[in-house]
Amino acid sequence: MADNKSTLPGLPDINGTLNRSMTPNTGWEGPYDMSVHLHWTQFPPVTEEWHYIIGVYITIVGLLGIMGNTTVVYIFSNTKSLRSPSNLFVVNLAVSDLIFSAVNGFPLLTVSSFHQKWIFGSLFCQLYGFVGGVFGLMSINTLTAISIDRYVVITKPLQASQTMTRRKVHLMIVIVWVLSILLSIPPFFGWGAYIPEGFQTSCTFDYLTKTARTRTYIVVLYLFGFLIPLIIIGVCYVLIIRGVRRHDQKMLTITRSMKTEDARANNKRARSELRISKIAMTVTCLFIISWSPYAIIALIAQFGPAHWITPLVSELPMMLAKSSSMHNPVVYALSHPKFRKALYQRVPWLFCCCKPKEKADFRTSVCSKRSVTRTESVNSDVSSVISNLSDSTTTLGLTSEGATRANRETSFRRSVSIIKGDEDPCTHPDTFLLAYKEVEVGNLFDMTDDQNRRDSNLHSLYIPTRVQHRPTTQSLGTTPGGVYIVDNGQRVNGLTFNS
C-alpha cells in the first residue's frame, strides 16, 4: 500500500501521470493539482489546531532565523577583526541558514499551514523541496569544512597560514555549493522526487516510495549528505581534542624554557583558537540534534515499519529541523567575544542588561597575525634586545600629528604599534590612534600629544603585551600622558631621550 502515490480521482499527480484507481480516505483533501502519497491516506486527517500551531511556530522560527542570520552576515562582513579566511565559512553558513529560513520556513510554510494544505502548486512544491535540500545540505557541508579548518589551525598552527589561505577557503566554499546542488538536483531528472509530506503543507524528498530509483537516491543522499560528513566532523574534533591535550603537555615544558610573557602570548593564541573550535563544535552538535530525527524518519520509512510514520511523527522532526537555522546567531551572541563586542558597538540596546566583558587583551582585539623576530641593537646606548614586529592587520587610524622627533642617535630599527588615549579600544575605537611605524636610524617618533610633551623629557615607555589600561601619571614618574606600545618582546625600562 505504501509503495504507490495517489491523487484525487482524475487529477494529475506530482509527475504529471494519472492514477484513477486510488480511493483516498475521506477527509484528506489535497490541493487541486497536487498528489497525496497513498501512505498518508491510511491515517485520520490532521486537526485544524495542529495546522495553526505549526503556522505560528514556523512564523517565529522563520523571523528569528532571518533576523539573526542577517545580523551574523552583517557583523562578520563589516568588522575588520572578524574578516579572516576562517570566518568566511561562518558567513557562508549564515547565508545558507538565511535562505533556508526565508524560503523553507516563513512565509510559504506559514501560509500553507493556515490554509491547511499546500496552495502553491506542483512546480513550487518541487522548487520548495529543492531549495530546502540544497541549503540543508549546504549547512552540514559547511560545518564539515569548518571542522577541517579548525583541525588544521589547532593541530598544525605553523602550516595553517599556508594551508587555509583565503583563496583555498573560497575554493572549499565553491565545492560546498557544488556538492549540495549535485545531491539535490536528481529528482528533477526522475531519480527520486519532491512531494508533500506529513501535514501536506510542505514538500521534501520522497522517502516513502520504495521503488529502486527512490531507494537508491535516498541511500546516496543519506551517505553523502549526512553520514559521511558526520564521520569527517567527528574525526576532526577527536583529533582536535587530542591535539589540545598534547599542547597542554608541551606548554608545561615550554613555559620553563621561555620568558613568561612569551609563553603567555603563545598560550593565549592557542586558547583563542580553541575557544572558536568549541563554538564550532556547539553549532555542529545543535545541527545534529536538529536533523538526526528527520534522517531517522527517512530510514524507517524506507527500511523499517513504515506504518510508524504518521503525519504527526513526520511533522515533529520537520519542525525541529526548521529550527536549526536560528541556532547559530544565538551561539555566536553568547560565546564569540569579538562578535559580541562588534554587536554591542552597533546595537548596544541588545545588551541593556548584560554588557560584554572587556578582556585586557588589546592585541587580540586588533591583530590577527603577528610574526616576531629578534635583533640586537648595535653601537647604541641601548644594549637590550629589541623586538622587531610586523603586523598584517590594518590599523584603526594613523596620524603623525603631535609627533616629536628625538635628537638622540639610535642605531636600531623597529616596527611598533602605538596607541594614544584613555578609553577602552573595544568600546571606544574612535578615540584611539593606532599606528605601525618603523623607527629609522637616528629618528624616534613619540606619538603623543605635543602640547603635553613639548617641554618635557621624552621617555620611551614600554607596556607589556595585553596591557591596555593607561597608567597613572604617578606610575610614570616624570612622564605626563604616555606612549603605549603593544608588543611581544622583552620589557625595556628607563630609555630617556631628550628633545
From Swiss-Prot:
Any single Gene Ontology cellular-component annotation = plasma membrane
Sugar attachment sites:
4, 15, 19
Q: Which PANTHER family match?
A: OPSIN
* Superkingdom: Eukaryota
According to its UniProt entry, the protein's GO biological process terms are: phototransduction; visual perception
Q: What organism is listed for this UniProt entry?
A: Mizuhopecten yessoensis (Japanese scallop)
Pfam families, sorted = 7tm_1
What protein name is recorded for this chain?
A: Rhodopsin, GQ-coupled
**Where is this gene product found?**
Membrane
